[in-house]
């Protein structure tokens, strides 16, 4: 498949399609079903689903996506965290910069056996009540969690060990991620050097602004925390040469101008940057703060004037 993607890019003169996979966070699943070094040779990105570590299928409450473990947790439970799972993929042979960390914008809920016992590990009788819109026991979208938090007699707790919040009211309990926990996870990701984030899923964020902090507050918090973060793709794997001994495709050259000719081209990976070609010489430039590059006009412009960059309006 990798060769097919490369061949399609060469024949069409388009950018190569990305070959990615969503993979489990469970250390047991990794060991049982994945040849990690072989996967890493061919995949552009490896999306690690670092969530659903705990849920209504268990008899004790646990957080959906803890960054770190409780000090009191068993050796097995300490492996059910974002930190451990992401690093397990590295230990098994995945390059740091190819690993994309899953960020949930939903919560897992439980019905407590005893409302007076609500800490992590408390006994549960099953999933919590179904959400008004998602309609699934044991699961709430972030905008449904906001409704839960707004109701009287709800207690919100920040778990300093796991670096995530949970809340309870009566016999209902929900573990989830908020702006604080997701910013913390992104900061951790940057420190460790992972490739980036993937969100599950954008439609579960507060897309109407019901929670009171604007539309898509969780997504925006992560994007803001990631601003300016870059990683170098240090390892791309020993890709095979097409049958027949054909030479490996050369990197497409952006600047093909005649000597003395100047042209401007947008950076397809960053609206705020562009390339200046002087003959065959390439220069990477940045627009002033608040502006993006308008390739049609060859100038830095307001985001509202560039359709592909309109999502940056107001930032």
Locate the predicted segments by residue.
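Glycan-binding loop/region signatures in secreted carbohydrate-active enzymes
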Residues: 54-76, 103-188, 208, 213-245, ...
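Disulfide-rich extracellular ectodomains of metazoan secreted and cell-surface proteins
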Residues: 185, 193, 200-203, 246, ...
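Solvent-exposed, polar/charged alpha-helical surfaces in well-ordered, non-transmembrane soluble domains
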Residues: 3, 37, 41, 83, ...
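Conserved beta-strand elements of beta-rich interaction domains across eukaryotes
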Residues: 24-26, 53, 106, 181, ...
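Acidic-and-aromatic substrate-binding clefts and catalytic sites of carbohydrate-active enzymes
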Residues: 25-30, 176, 205-206
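Well-ordered beta-strand positions
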Residues: 44-45, 196, 273
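Cysteine-rich, disulfide-bonded extracellular modules and peptides in secreted proteins
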Residues: 231, 243-315
């Amino acid at each position: 498949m990798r060769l097919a993607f490369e061949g399609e890019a060469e024949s069409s003169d388009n950018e190569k399609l990305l070959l990615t996979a969503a993979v489990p966070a469970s250390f047991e699943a990794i060991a049982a079903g994945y040849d990690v070094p072989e996967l890493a040779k061919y995949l552009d990105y490896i999306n690690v689903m670092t969530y659903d570590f705990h849920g209504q299928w268990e008899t004790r409450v646990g957080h959906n996506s803890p960054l770190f473990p409780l000090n009191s947790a068993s050796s097995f439970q300490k492996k059910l965290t974002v930190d451990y799972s992401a690093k397990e993929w590295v230990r098994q042979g995945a390059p740091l910069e190819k690993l994309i960390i899953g960020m949930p914008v939903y919560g897992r809920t439980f019905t407590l056996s005893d409302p007076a016992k609500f800490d992590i590990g408390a006994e549960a009788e099953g999933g919590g009540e179904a959400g008004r819109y998602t309609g699934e026991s044991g699961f709430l979208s972030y905008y449904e969690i906001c409704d839960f938090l707004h109701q009287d007699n709800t207690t919100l707790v920040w778990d300093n060990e796991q670096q995530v919040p949970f809340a309870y009211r009566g016999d209902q309990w929900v573990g989830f991620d908020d702006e604080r926990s997701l910013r913390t996870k992104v900061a951790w990701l940057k420190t460790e050097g992972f490739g980036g984030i993937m969100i599950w899923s954008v439609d579960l964020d507060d897309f109407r602004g019901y929670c009171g902090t604007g539309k898509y507050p969780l997504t925006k918090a992560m994007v803001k925390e990631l601003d300016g973060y870059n990683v170098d793709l240090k390892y791309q794997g020993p890709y095979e040469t097409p049958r027949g001994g054909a030479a490996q495709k050369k990197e497409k050259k952006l600047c093909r101008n005649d000597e003395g000719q100047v042209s401007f081209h947008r950076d397809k990976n960053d609206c705020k940057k562009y390339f200046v070609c002087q003959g065959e010489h390439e220069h990477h430039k940045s627009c002033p703060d608040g502006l993006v590059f308008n390739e049609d006009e060859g100038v830095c412009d307001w985001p509202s004037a560039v359709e592909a960059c309109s999502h940056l309006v107001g930032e």
